């Protein structure tokens, strides 16, 4: 290839071959990535499972559940998946925080998984003490330094409360909302996230699942179903 006037010739071997080496002679050109493949896979999976996908969910309805103890305040929401399992309704929505630091760190996006059911009656809020992302870890560390001594055990379960922050109106109500089988499951599986239980509603926000796609949503729905069954069983 000739150099433009006034420019030196390119170095030997320029331009470099593409990653993985040059394609063999006569090979067809590589197909461009399909930007809509993930959405089509999601649409097909939702239809197969009998779920409902809503591109314009009601922001005010989600806001009406606040205040929560640990759940992040919503700035906006994206797509919503709905499902019905017996008496329980499931709503999974893309949720975004209005936090510029978290946005830059890629930690402002979450999955809000809300289960509505008349079986839920008692109140408790828990938050894993690790795994919430760098910004949350730093904020929690500074909060611990500034707050000084702990408020004491909320449940009378030091093993559980070593791993989770807990808030509940009373020890009795907290133990009713968080049965031992549910606590053991959370500990044994190394679960990390936020779980808020109140009359008629259970909110789960997993720390390690943020994408709104089939590989993420399938295990998240299974997980929130397990937590609901253990909370009401």
Locations of regions flagged by a protein language model:
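Charged, low-complexity intrinsically disordered regions
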Residues: 3-23, 36-233
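A short, highly charged nucleic-acid-interacting micro-segment common to nuclease
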Residues: 28-37
């Amino acid at each position: 290839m000739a150099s433009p006037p006034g420019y030196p010739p390119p170095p030997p071997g320029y331009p470099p071959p593409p990653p993985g080496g040059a394609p063999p002679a006569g090979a067809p050109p590589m197909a461009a990535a399909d930007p809509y493949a993930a959405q089509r896979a999601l649409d097909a999976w939702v239809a197969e499972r009998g779920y409902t996908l809503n591109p314009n969910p009601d922001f005010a309805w989600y806001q009406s559940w606040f205040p929560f103890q640990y759940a992040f305040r919503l700035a906006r929401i994206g797509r919503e998946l709905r499902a019905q399992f017996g008496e329980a309704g499931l709503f999974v929505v893309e949720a975004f925080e209005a936090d510029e630091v978290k946005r830059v760190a890629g930690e402002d996006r979450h999955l809000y998984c809300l289960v509505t059911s008349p079986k839920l009656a008692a109140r408790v809020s828990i938050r894993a003490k690790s795994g919430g992302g760098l910004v949350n870890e730093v904020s929690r560390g500074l909060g611990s330094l500034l707050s000084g001594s702990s408020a004491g055990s909320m449940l009378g379960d030091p093993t559980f409360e070593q791993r989770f922050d807990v808030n509940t109106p009373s020890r009795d109500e907290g133990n009713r909302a968080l049965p031992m089988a549910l606590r053991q499951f959370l500990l044994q599986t190394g679960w990390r996230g936020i779980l808020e239980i109140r009359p008629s509603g259970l909110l789960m926000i997993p720390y390690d699942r943020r994408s709104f796609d089939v590989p993420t949503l399938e295990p998240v729905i299974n997980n929130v179903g397990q937590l609901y069954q253990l909370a009401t069983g």
